[in-house]
Curated annotation (Swiss-Prot):
This is RNA pseudouridine synthase 6, chloroplastic. It catalyses: a uridine in RNA = a pseudouridine in RNA. Residues 101-208 form the S4 RNA-binding domain. The active site is at D261. GO terms for molecular function: pseudouridine synthase activity; RNA binding. Its EC number is 5.4.99.-. Its main location: plastid.
Amino acid sequence: MASPALTGGYRNLTAPVSLLRTLASTRVTTPLFRSNKHSPRFISSPKRFTCLSLLKTDSQNQTTLSSSSNSGYHEYNRLMPCPAYNLPPRIEHMVVLEDDVLVSEFISKQLDLPPLYVADLIRFGAVHYALVCPKPPPTATPEEIILFEEVTSPSVLKKRSSIKGKTVREAQKTFRVTHTNQYAEAGTYLRVHVHPKRSPRCYEIDWKSRIVAVTDSYVILDKPAGTTVGGTTDNIEESCATFASRALDLPEPLKTTHQIDNCTEGCVVFARTKEYCSVFHTKIRNKEVKKLYRALAAAPLPIGIISHYMRPKNMAPRLVAEDSIQGWHLCQLEVLECKKIPWPDAATEKKHDIEDCGWTSKEFAYECTINLLTGKTHQIRAQLAACGAPLVGDSMYMPAAIAEMGNPDTNPYGKAKKHYTMEENQKETAVAEWIDRHGKEPRVGIGLQACQISWDDDDGEHFYEAGTPWWR
């Protein structure tokens, strides 16, 4: 989305390279730092130029910068071919201090990155901007706070025509930089995900074979496990939407209408037009879309409706409680069928990259058909784990379920209901310890498939099924 502060144009940059101040050089390491996409935890890198250092141009308009190799960072070339591993996250936050700055050139010079690498980052959707700098996190240094106050002071903002008619909060909303020829004005905030999270699985899949249906309005994809539906904050290139669009040689890229977890396989609906995208979103809001799932659980589940309440924090793991807690969201699913089947053998698990999460009894598993009544993130995974029947291969929720089976007091929201009798500080400690019992997100797949999706339109019923799940 373009704005007067960030526009495209094929003209030479005549102004000198802009002055730059770095808000923060972020290197987030897990599991020491937990973050969500709205409020990441920040630490300043000691190997990069000092935070908030003012990089000045000399008389020849040349900026002095340390090279990536000298700074201790990875040596950069191109984002392709896709590596089999991810580099540690590196997120750079910057504020432009001069007008008429070519964003791609600015990033290349200030972060000492090859121009082609920056072009790749922009193509991947890893570069974001806001007209006004967002508020720094609580971990910001005094110098960072001073810079923020300088570039967002009312006397400065009232002179910027690009934000007239907008509230400060509206002007702080971030958008993607979509072209290498976009320009920025003074005061523009830039966030660069230098090491986007990669998805090598995308290059291993025969995408045409995963297409279930193609109509004038939408496409149904049997999504492979280990892929994202529409991409991530730092990578929209390596996604189901992009690769399915290419497989079908479509003139316009497919549009995301709903999500399923990366580790889940099965039916996903992509809209071919903005109009149908809006139509399908409305159907989802009105609960007119029916979704059935096949779940491979480690223990049996009762037939019928299972209800929990989910903590409203938008971060994993998702915590659920059996009893209603003020502000928590009701989650309901209906188990329609639960049948005992052999646990997948080691060769099958290895073939599909299913992780061994420590479940001891592996003679039988339980294939359940589930009608999802509410559509919360991680809902089936979190609810089944809370029932003592985590999904096979779920490296995030199965370790916590195992811990609770060994000691019910481990879960402050479980059957022991410890949170009722705790002081506030004790509760916070217990919740933090319970979160730590959970593991990392699965690398590829788990025992979960979106097996059916259906809805009605003016032209009748639309009903689609996914293929055979990996465990059969």
